[in-house]
Amino acid sequence: MSSNWVDISKDTNTGIETIRAHFTGHAYDPHWHSSYLIGVTESGIQQFHCRKKQINSHAGQVFMLEPEEIHDGHAPASDGFTYQMLYLHPEWLKQRLQGLFHNSPDHYELVIDAPLKSDDQLAIITSQAFRHLHYKEMNIVKDNSLDVLIQYIAQGKWLKKASQSS
């Protein structure tokens, strides 16, 4: 019997999906998402390849990916790893950024400078937002925790993206 498990939830107001999961051994093949990912490794070591590097996320570390970043997943230790994650849709995030930062031009997007962060405050803020969405707290509580998270991760990190030609 496998000790792997996955618990998925979706917030009806924001469309944000949350996942809490535990994997041992091979967790998932290389893939990508159309959303921004931000999560916290709760226990164990989560090993993944991203941006042409092998990354080891330990308990308490935060991992963040931009849309379409290819990554995989593996548990190098026999006891596996547990993580929690939020999937933030780019359009929702863009609207939220413009609401929080009124000087945010339409043609700018959030850029994740590094996929792994050792930042205790960010881990706490991310876990709070996860819990409030995953366990369906009141909307005002969810909205506030998301605003705190977005303000923390944005911290002035903007990069002009080239517009796609039609």
Regions found by a protein language model. Give the residues of each.
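Amphipathic alpha-helical segments enriched in hydrophobic/aromatic residues interleaved with Lys/Arg
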Residues: 102-166
